[in-house]
């Protein structure tokens, strides 16, 4: 849209880019939304209907939609299991970029609900890709598509793992992510879709779900420190992972869609640490010995374990100019600080009689 300036020159007002984000209420979705808003985007997110509000990770950036000039993040009901809703929202929103972050993303849970995991993670990605393809054809558009992959796809393949490393998935979740990865490659090759796979290694933050091991540790640690909890039960503490900061990784997602040609990229810190090392750093940071509080529970071991994941992100560094900013110890301490403050607030409630002092989070 053009406007005339006082000196007679025509000033071109560049329209805002529009992004559609599935999984917007999750850890990655919230950080990506913040990042895109800072870049001047209008961001739309698909959320599933829930009996309880599940948008707490977005509350700090939420603006009442009645304030149309400032509400640049908008939420809509949709689901990767419902193809009609995906196509409908593409037609209504007309996004420039689609980021598919939605998933049943817990590895252990995927063994309990494998059908659902495959339907949402694998077939859900296929539904969204097909919706993008048909929307592009019918409307003469060229949406760019990002598919969230996972280092779990590599499974038992020895590290370091790069874009050329063979996949060997060891869970229904990982197998479903492999399917989504290849659907994305197929739509890129068959239909010329600008579609990228981001193979992200483990990335954490204070917004990480509490049933993931890193947040489970820091959440329990905060409560132990203030006297609300005494024990933490864990599974395989020798498992080694390449842990980075989620806030760093969303930048890599965006960069993939800003290139001349679509491609697939590994995103990782290129450092690997065991769960035991995470315990050492986190408990040591607050002056505690984890051995006094942690017990190993065989129930938390998976039917097939993934022992060591360590990424080779040289391609992302060279082609995207991306590199992680937050190191392992800084990440751990960031998470401990946040969860210690949360535990202190819980302690106030417990002391006032509003919650059971030993109530687990």
From Swiss-Prot:
CDD domains, per the entry: GDP_MD_SDR_e
Q: Which reaction does it catalyse?
A: GDP-alpha-D-mannose = GDP-4-dehydro-alpha-D-rhamnose + H2O
Q: In which tissues is it expressed?
A: Expressed in roots,stipules and pollen just before anthesis. Primarily localized to the root meristem and columella root cap. Not expressed in emerging lateral roots.
Any one GO biological process: 'de novo' GDP-L-fucose biosynthetic process
Q: Name one Pfam family in it.
A: GDP_Man_Dehyd
Give the record's GO CC terms. plastid
Q: Which cofactor does it need?
A: NADP(+)
Active site, per annotation: 150, 152 (nucleophile), 173 (nucleophile)
Q: Which keywords does this chain's UniProt record carry?
A: Lyase, NADP
One Gene Ontology term of the molecular function aspect: GDP-mannose 4,6-dehydratase activity
Question: Kind of enzyme, top EC level?
Answer: lyase
Q: SUPFAM superfamilies from the entry?
A: NAD(P)-binding Rossmann-fold domains (SSF51735)
Residues given in the record as NADP(+) binding sites: 23-28, 79-80, 101-105, 116, 177, 203, 208
What's its EC? 4.2.1.47
Biochemical pathway: Nucleotide-sugar biosynthesis; GDP-L-fucose biosynthesis via de novo pathway; GDP-L-fucose from GDP-alpha-D-mannose: step 1/2
Summarizing the function annotation, the protein's role is: Catalyzes the conversion of GDP-D-mannose to GDP-4-dehydro-6-deoxy-D-mannose.
What family name appears in the similarity comment? Answer: Belongs to the NAD(P)-dependent epimerase/dehydratase family. GDP-mannose 4,6-dehydratase subfamily.
Q: Which PANTHER family match?
A: GDP-MANNOSE 4,6 DEHYDRATASE 1, GDP-MANNOSE 4,6-DEHYDRATASE
Q: Which HAMAP family match?
A: GDP_Man_dehydratase
Subunit structure comment from the entry? Homotetramer.
Stored NCBIfam families: gmd
Q: What's the protein name?
A: GDP-mannose 4,6 dehydratase 1
């Amino acid at each position: 849209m053009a406007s005339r300036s006082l000196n007679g020159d025509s000033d071109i007002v560049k329209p805002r880019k529009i992004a559609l984000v599935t999984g917007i209420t999750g850890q990655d979705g919230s950080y990506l939304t913040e990042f895109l808003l800072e870049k001047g985007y209008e961001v739309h997110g698909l959320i599933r209907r829930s009996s309880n509000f599940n948008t707490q990770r977005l509350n700090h950036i939420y603006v009442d939609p009645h304030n149309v000039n400032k509400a640049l993040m908008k939420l809509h009901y949709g689901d990767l299991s419902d193809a009609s809703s995906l196509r409908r929202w593409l037609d209504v929103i007309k996004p420039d970029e689609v980021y598919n972050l939605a998933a049943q993303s817990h590895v252990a849970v995927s063994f309990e609900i494998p059908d659902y995991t495959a339907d949402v993670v694998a077939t859900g990605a296929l539904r969204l890709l097909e919706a993008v393809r048909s929307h592009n054809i019918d409307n003469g558009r060229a949406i760019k598509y990002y598919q969230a992959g996972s280092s779990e796809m590599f499974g038992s393949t020895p590290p370091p793992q790069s874009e050329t490393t063979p996949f060997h998935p060891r869970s229904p979740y990982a197998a479903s992510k492999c399917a989504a990865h290849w659907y994305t490659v197929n739509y890129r090759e068959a239909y010329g879709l600008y579609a990228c796979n981001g193979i992200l290694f483990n990335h954490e933050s204070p917004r990480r779900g509490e049933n993931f091991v890193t947040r489970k540790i820091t959440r329990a640690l905060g409560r132990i420190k203030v006297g609300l909890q005494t024990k933490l039960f864990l599974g395989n503490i020798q498992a080694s992972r390449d842990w980075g900061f989620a806030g760093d990784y969303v930048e890599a997602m965006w960069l993939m869609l800003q290139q001349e040609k679509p491609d697939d990229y590994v995103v990782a810190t290129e450092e690997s640490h065991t769960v035991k090392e995470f315990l050492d750093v986190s408990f040591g940071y607050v002056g505690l010995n984890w051995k006094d509080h942690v017990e190993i529970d065989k129930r938390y071991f998976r039917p097939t374990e993934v022992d060591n994941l360590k990424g080779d992100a040289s391609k992302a560094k060279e082609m995207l100019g991306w590199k992680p900013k937050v190191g392992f110890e800084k990440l751990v301490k960031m998470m401990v600080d946040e969860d210690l403050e949360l535990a202190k607030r819980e302690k106030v409630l417990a002391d006032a009689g509003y919650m059971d002092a030993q109530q687990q989070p």
